[in-house]
A protein has these predicted regions:
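Interdomain "pre-motor" coupling segment immediately N-terminal to P-loop NTPase/helicase cores
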Residues: 51-110
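Flexible glycine-/small-residue-rich
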Residues: 22-24, 52-54, 61, 177, ...
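Conserved helicase motor core of SF1/SF2 NTP-dependent helicases
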Residues: 118-128, 136-246, 250-341
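P-loop NTP-binding catalytic core
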Residues: 104-125, 130-131
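Compact, well-ordered interaction domains used in eukaryotic information-processing assemblies
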Residues: 40, 46-49, 55
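Short amphipathic alpha-helix segments
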Residues: 27-44
């Protein structure tokens, strides 16, 4: 067995070399990353060896992985030539994108600027699904973004909303989510309305403050240009010329979802986000998000965009955590099924 293993390693057909030359020394340094961090990420993820020689790279490894590494490096360099600053996270995203679809063009995704945040950070899609989501929001009046935590569903929707507000395409932004932990009543909590509502809407405020500086956000909220409110407060209203975002939609009941969708007035757009695997409703209660998908998936003018763990845009461990939990849940479900038999 040991001899067989050695034979595979030394087989000239088992490895391939690629040589890449780069003309701009400054861009080449940016391509490598600080302390060659970008190269280290590529080596670890693709299991190839990359050597730096002057302003060139030598890649060695499995033929398919070597070609993939070369393609990723060429496209990252192309982004740098366009003035896009490549960070380690971008290398991770590039690996995921091109591993899933070798025909993908990083420039089509990463250079699609949505908004420049309060911290002067350019907000762009970071996966094929995120790009499809942004394109859907631009094109359709009602868009559902469904998938696990960390895929950028709410954050990108808010970036689009703020960008459209700043262009005067809408007169206000409305951010809402069901306060399921309080049964949408909020009556037993201490304090005035703002204090009661705040814990359930804090994630929306956090994302808002990442895009608009604190003082400006406060003024927009005070004027009613940006409204952050629990879903129950949407009842009986007609929302005209508004960009409306419903977050945590998996925790709506079918009645609440229908109520929300029928609030939409002239010149308005709605984005509904949620994770159908994270429902916190009481046992036996149907999810409005699941019902909406079943009822509306064929309706013209409504778009559903699905995300997976491959689209997770948080710390790289978040994707590993999601995958591990899903694997464990599947194992438990299989074991329970076997025991019933």
């Amino acid at each position: 067995m040991k001899d067989e293993k050695n034979r595979v390693i030394t087989d000239p057909q088992a490895t391939e070399n690629a040589h890449l030359e780069f003309n701009d020394p400054r861009l080449f340094r940016d391509l490598l990353g600080q302390h060659d961090q970008h190269i280290k990420i590529l080596q670890q993820a693709l299991e190839v060896r990359i050597r730096v020689r002057g302003s060139s790279l030598e890649i060695e490894g499995d033929p398919l992985q070597t070609e993939l590494a070369a393609q990723i490096i060429r496209q990252l360099y192309g982004l740098l030539e366009k003035g896009y600053p490549v960070y380690p996270s971008d290398v991770d995203y590039a690996i995921r994108i091109l591993s899933g679809d070798s025909r993908a063009k990083l420039q089509d995704i990463f250079l699609d600027t949505i908004y420049i945040s309060a911290h002067k950070r350019t907000i762009t899609p970071k996966s094929i699904a995120q790009k499809a989501y942004i394109d859907a929001i631009r094109r359709y009046d009602i868009v559902f973004g469904i998938g696990p935590a960390g895929t950028g569903k709410t954050y990108l929707a808010m970036a689009m909303a703020v960008a459209e507000l700043m262009k005067n395409n809408f007169v206000r932004i409305i951010l809402t989510r069901p306060a399921v932990e309080a049964g949408e009543k909020l009556g037993f909590l201490p304090g005035d309305l703002a204090e009661k509502v705040n814990p359930y809407l804090r994630p929306l405020y956090d994302a808002l403050h990442d895009m608009v500086d604190f003082d400006r956000a406060r003024k927009l909220v005070e004027r009613g240009t940006i409204e952050v409110a629990p879903l129950a407060f949407m009842r009986g209203r007609t929302l005209n010329d508004s960009f409306v975002i419903l977050d945590e939609a998996q925790n709506t009941t079918p009645e609440q979802m229908k109520m929300f969708l029928t609030r939409l007035g002239y010149g308005s757009k709605a984005v509904i986000t949620g994770d159908a695997t994270q429902i916190d409703l009481p046992a036996g209660k149907a999810s409005g998000l699941k019902e909406a998908f079943r009822i509306l998936k064929g309706v013209h003018g409504i778009r559903f965009v699905n995300f997976t763990e491959k689209d997770v845009a948080r710390h790289h461990l978040v994707q590993e955590i999601i995958t591990a939990y899903e694997r464990d849940e599947n194992q438990i479900a299989s074991r329970d099924l076997s025991e019933k038999r």
